[in-house]
């Protein structure tokens, strides 16, 4: 090699000496080859990797997003399996010094990955896992390990030998390593598939958390035993064990309080100072260096520090946002290049592939069995158990790094390492596709009957699911429940769902609050919400039944919990309560509910017009409700719910039926017009009470409708509208062009617009 000046052996190790020429090059113009300098070569390697990775992403885009697959393929292409067959290329791009630099960046990348993923894991969640997840975790730890060892013995004996050049001891070690799993990998995959707050996702995460706890305990025990066996000086072994315990204690009782101090010094809503971030990086490097000094893998220090990091922002997820971009964009290419350099596919024959895959297949099947048996015993649906089995079989960067650690310590050969990485890459991609398709099939919720207010019999109990995202929304929700409460007859069933964003938790949660709140404890925010609903239920025991839930989920999939509860509880209508300041992600939540709910959906925009029923006697209250009826299924559903509200003694209902200049329905669809006419006739016949007024208003164009709303709108406390209407209605023409929130429909959107300057609360309904 051109840069080598001396090669010699010392202590049985080959030493390679090169002259130090600096990190940066003066450039081609001054007669220097930039590829002989560390920095230009590193930048070129990262650039080439990025080109390959983006190219694979583009080619695979029609089939979905496969980040792990595209990264591994790019790394393998840069290694000896593809381009690396050219010796000149390897000598230019990956000579000895550049490989050392790549491997150094690879280690730094993985310790950062360990930290930013582990610092989002809330260890308190282990207390909340159920009995099934606990059993799953134990069996996931035991069964793949045992079955893997038996499979290694049988393959070696029945097939007369394992893969060529792989001794039996190494083959057994491959089986042990293959049985490992990582919570962080499953968390990342479920997050990308938007399955974190699904039932299979929760079970998989909880089971993996138990498995990881057992694995780390076993890992520490194995390290302690290895130190005692390998070190002839028992006092030195004991001393190293003590230093390991001291490291954990220092991280827990020195580093953690320091990070808590940084958190408390950071104003709420602000990100960490750059100086604080630098201190945390120093703590990370100290932890990893200490782990290396006391005989532990360097990433163990990163994992322990991540677990000790406070989970509340600006730490936890805040750190991930701060460091993540640099890690995934700059360090990750170095990591994958280092992996690809050690994979040479030309070493494999079909005989080797079959033997390796037989072993890996047995271990994967063992993981499926470990999930399926207890799940079926606890009456989990078969397809849910199969789905969880596929999820826990997905592998990722953590698994690859464990393979690399074993390769570095010469416990497995280059052939075994390549087989494990390729198998993890290919099979995990297949499993991700299977999980995605299976879940899409399972998540289609088709109710066996029409679940709407219109089709709910008058004598049957109305079942309402009301969801909200903050404590301030509890009062308007209870106001709406009070208005929906029947004076006599079957009780109203209410399912109250408190929606919390998944930003301070490691696991999505769906909590069913069934126990009374202890009066001797300081109530949390959740407890205060639950207590408010329970107090309302006690006050109206004969007419209202309330169940409370808390759903902690990512914003993008928050609707999944609402839809699941609505389906399981067979609700007739879901009501989402929002205040006037609607955020962009809340509009996404509205759209998801409107598209996916198995029953009717209502969007309630509270503007403070409804009174607080807790402090004013019902006899002294008058609630004025207006209903705008154009026609169509949504308007019929709205009218059915308005009729229910009108049965409340404090409600005065006024229905505006909008007709054209000829006094007939503006709809062109004759079937819908006939349905509307039948509903209107029944409504007028059965609701001739003094508290209900029915008016027909002739509207020629949108300007007349705006004049009506501007004139009458503020006379009401609540205005009810349908969301969807027939397209190209003359009286709605042009209203959608200045839309503020099209999820409410044209009329609902106009009611909350700033142009009309109305203060009425709005309830928009979709059947």
Swiss-Prot record:
Sorted alphabetically, which keywords does the UniProt record give? Antiport, Ion transport, Membrane, Potassium, Potassium transport, Transmembrane, Transmembrane helix, Transport
Query: Which ranges does the record mark as transmembrane?
Result: 39-59, 63-83, 99-119, 135-155, 173-193, 205-225, 242-262, 280-300, 323-343, 371-391, 415-435
One annotated GO biological process: potassium ion transport
Q: Where in the cell does this protein reside?
A: Membrane
GO MF, one annotated term: antiporter activity
User: Ribonucleoprotein: is it a keyword of this entry?
Assistant: no
Keyword Ion transport set for record: yes
Which Cys-Cys disulphide bridges does the record give? none
**What tissues harbor this protein?**
Specifically expressed in pollen.
A Pfam family recorded for this sequence:
CHX17_C
What are the GO cellular component annotations? Answer: membrane
Give the membrane topology, semicolon-separated if more than one.
Multi-pass membrane protein
Record's function text: May operate as a cation/H(+) antiporter.
The family annotation for this protein states: Belongs to the monovalent cation:proton antiporter 2 (CPA2) transporter (TC 2.A.37) family. CHX (TC 2.A.37.4) subfamily.
> What name has this protein been given in UniProt?
Cation/H(+) antiporter 27
Q: Which organism is it from?
A: Arabidopsis thaliana
């Amino acid at each position: 090699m051109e840069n080598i000046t001396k090669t010699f052996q010392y202590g049985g190790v080959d030493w390679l000496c090169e002259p130090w020429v600096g990190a940066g090059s003066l450039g081609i113009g001054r007669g220097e080859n930039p590829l002989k300098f560390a920095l230009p070569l590193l930048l070129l390697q990262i650039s080439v990797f990025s080109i390959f990775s983006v190219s694979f992403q583009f080619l695979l885009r029609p089939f979905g997003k496969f980040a792990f697959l595209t990264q591994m393929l790019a790394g393998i292409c840069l290694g000896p399996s593809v381009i690396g067959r050219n010796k000149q290329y390897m000598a230019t791009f990956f000579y000895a010094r550049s490989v050392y630099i790549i491997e150094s960046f690879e280690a730094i990348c993985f310790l950062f990955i360990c930290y930013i993923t582990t610092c989002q894991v809330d260890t308190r969640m282990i207390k909340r896992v159920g009995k099934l997840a606990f059993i799953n975790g134990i069996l996931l730890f035991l069964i793949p390990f045992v079955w893997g060892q038996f499979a290694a013995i049988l393959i070696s004996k029945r097939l007369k030998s394992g893969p060529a050049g792989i001794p039996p001891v190494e083959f057994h070690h491959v089986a042990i390593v293959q049985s490992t799993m990582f919570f962080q990998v499953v968390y990342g995959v479920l997050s990308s598939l938007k399955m974190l707050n699904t039932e299979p996702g929760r079970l998989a995460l909880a089971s993996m958390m138990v498995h990881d706890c057992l694995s780390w305990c076993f890992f520490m025990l194995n390290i302690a035993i290895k130190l005692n066996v390998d070190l002839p000086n028992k006092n030195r072994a004991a001393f190293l064990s003590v230093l390991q315990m001291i490291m954990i204690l220092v991280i827990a009782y020195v580093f953690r309080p320091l990070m808590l101090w940084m958190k408390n010094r950071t104003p709420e809503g602000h990100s960490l100072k750059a100086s604080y971030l630098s201190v945390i990086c120093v703590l990370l490097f100290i932890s990893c260096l200490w782990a290396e000094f006391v005989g532990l893998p360097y990433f163990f220090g990163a994992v322990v520090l991540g677990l000790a990091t406070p989970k509340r922002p600006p730490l936890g997820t805040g750190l991930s946002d701060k460091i993540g971009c640099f890690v995934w964009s700059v360090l990750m290419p170095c990591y994958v290049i280092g992996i690809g350099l050690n994979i040479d596919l030309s070493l494999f024959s079909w005989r080797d592939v079959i033997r390796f895959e037989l072993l890996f297949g047995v271990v994967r099947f063992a993981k499926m069995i470990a999930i399926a048996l207890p799940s079926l015993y606890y009456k989990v649906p078969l397809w849910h158990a199969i789905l969880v089995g596929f999820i826990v079989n997905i592998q990722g960067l953590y698994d690859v790094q464990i393979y690399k650690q074993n390769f570095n310590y010469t416990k497995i050969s280059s052939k075994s390492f390549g087989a494990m990485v390729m198998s993890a890459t290919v099979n995990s991609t297949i499993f991700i596709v299977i999980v995605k398709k299976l879940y899409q099939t399972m998540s289609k919720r088709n109710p066996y009957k029409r679940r709407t207010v219109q089709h709910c019999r008058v004598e049957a109990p109305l079942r309402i699911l009301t969801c909200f995202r903050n404590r301030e929304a509890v009062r308007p929700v209870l106001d709406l429940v009070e208005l929906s409460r029947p004076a006599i007859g079957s009780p109203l069933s209410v399912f109250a769902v408190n929606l919390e964003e998944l930003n301070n938790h490691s696991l999505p949660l769906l909590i069913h609050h069934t126990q009374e709140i202890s009066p001797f404890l300081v109530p949390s925010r959740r407890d205060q919400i639950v207590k408010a609903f329970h107090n309302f239920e006690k006050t109206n025991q004969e007419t209202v039944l309330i169940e409370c839930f808390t759903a902690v989920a990512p914003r993008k999939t928050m609707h999944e919990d609402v839809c699941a509860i609505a389906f399981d509880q067979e609700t007739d209508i879901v009501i989402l309560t929002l205040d006037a300041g609607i955020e962009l992600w809340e509009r996404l939540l509205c759209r998801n509910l409107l598209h996916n709910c198995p029953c009717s959906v209502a969007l309630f925009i509270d503007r403070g017009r409804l009174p607080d029923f807790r402090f004013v006697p019902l006899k002294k209250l008058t609630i004025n409700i207006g209903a705008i009826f154009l026609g169509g299924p949504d308007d019929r559903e709205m009218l059915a719910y308005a009729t229910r509200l009108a049965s409340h003694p404090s409600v005065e209902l006024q229905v505006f039926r909008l007709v054209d200049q000829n006094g007939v329905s503006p709809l062109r669809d004759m079937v819908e017009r006939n349905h509307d006419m039948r509903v209107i006739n029944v409504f007028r016949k059965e609701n001739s009470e003094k508290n209900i007024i029915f008016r027909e208003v002739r509207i020629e164009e949108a300007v007349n409708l705006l004049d009506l709303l501007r004139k009458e709108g503020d006379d009401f406390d609540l205005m009810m509208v349908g969301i969807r209407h027939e397209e190209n209605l003359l009286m709605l023409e042009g209203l959608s062009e200045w839309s503020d929130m099209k999820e409410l429909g044209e009329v609902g959107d106009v009611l909350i617009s700033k142009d009309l300057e109305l203060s009425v609360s709005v309830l928009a309904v979709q059947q």
